[in-house]
Amino acid sequence: MTYSPNIPVHPTHSQIGNSQSAAYRAPARPRTRTMARPYNISWLTPDGEERFDTVVAPALPVIESACANMARGALVATATGPVAVEDLAPGMLVITSEYGPIPLQWIGSYEMSLREAQTADRGALFRVTSDAFGLAKPAHDLLLAPRSHILFRHAKCRSLFGVDLAFAPVRAFEDGMAVFSVQPASPIAVFNLGFDRQATIKVSGIELESFHPGPHTEALIDDEMKYALLRLFPQARGLDFFGPQLINRLTTFEVRAIREGA
């Protein structure tokens, strides 16, 4: 080997470090980015005025479910008769099972895209066929969001909650005939309604839960997610705006166990 005074025979420490870092540097992990979407909201101010806004917020279940209960075309019972959900406005008197007609405080909606509709958990809607829960319940086919809750009356609810009723997720009633999941062929708007309390609204003859965050939501989400959720409710300073959860919710498993006599 020919010796050259300008080139070291043994690599220096810095050369080893540079070569090793180049050879063994772990690839950078891509940052996880949460998809966002526009949510359309309208609400009633303390002065009784109607306001509208579009809020860009994360496309995550806790946010989406706040604005997704029923699809466009659902007929909501009001003091003046059935009104399509897309034609409702804050301040209108909506018929509730517990309180009779009360002012609608908030409407949230977003457009479910075709791509989302092809995602089984988040996108699929549930078609509830006419008379699925009895005569005119519903009066006509109804499209509900995956996290919609239907008022479920059964004596076995009393052993769980002390009363014979609870809200049950629509997917608990899926049977492939009267209630089944569908994937819309085109984008479709979904809506939810909110009051200053938990309420049972009458939609096309069946009873649905209005928006309510639930008793444990605040403990289950971080401050950032809580802030994102509250941006959808300009009239509320906190999740306690919606009052206590007076009617409990059952899980899909619990509903099926009750119906099967377990």
Ranges and model annotations:
Residues 56-59:
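Serine/threonine-rich, low-complexity linker/repeat segments that form flexible spacers/stalks
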